[in-house]
Amino acid sequence: MTQTLIPLNFLAVAIGAALGACARWLAGLWLNSSAWPWGTLLVNLAGGYLIGLALAVLLAHPEWPQWIRLAAVTGFLGGLTTFSTFSAETVGMLERGAYATALGYAALSLVGSLALTALGLASAHALR
């Protein structure tokens, strides 16, 4: 699929990213604690599942306009998930000497996100 630089595509990414970033911020406010960043973990795992689901649905509908994929995947899911926050939280745990917690968080985030991306793809295929 070729990318077209049109104002609608910019707007789709911007609106999607703003909504995704706000959802991530709210999840952090509601769920993060000093002991464990549950909000970040949740949005990264949910994002893994949702991107798998979205990609499968979008691949099944190549006739859909480009802005839908840009708003949903590049915008919303790009704004929702965060590798930089995950990295900062993991390094913070390491700096506090919480090595086992940091390792568990990193492993759960990585393996969980990969597994949920695969589950999202499988879910979309099962619904066809």
Curated annotation (Swiss-Prot):
One of its GO terms (biological process) is cellular detoxification of fluoride. Keywords: Cell inner membrane, Cell membrane, Ion channel, Ion transport, Membrane, Metal-binding, Sodium, Transmembrane, Transmembrane helix, Transport. It comes from the Bacteria. Na(+) binds at residues 78, 81. Disulfide bonds: none annotated. One of its GO terms (molecular function) is metal ion binding. Pfam families: CRCB. Na(+) is not transported, but it plays an essential structural role and its presence is essential for fluoride channel function. The keyword Transmembrane applies. It is found in: Cell inner membrane. It catalyses: fluoride(in) = fluoride(out). The chain crosses the membrane at residues 10-30, 40-60, 71-91, 102-122. It is a multi-pass membrane protein. GO terms for cellular component: plasma membrane. Belongs to the fluoride channel Fluc/FEX (TC 1.A.43) family. NCBIfam families: crcB (TIGR00494), PRK14196.1 (NF010792). Fluoride-specific ion channel. Important for reducing fluoride concentration in the cell, thus reducing its toxicity. This is Fluoride-specific ion channel FluC. The lineage of its organism: Bacteria, Pseudomonadati, Pseudomonadota, Betaproteobacteria, Burkholderiales. The gene is fluC.
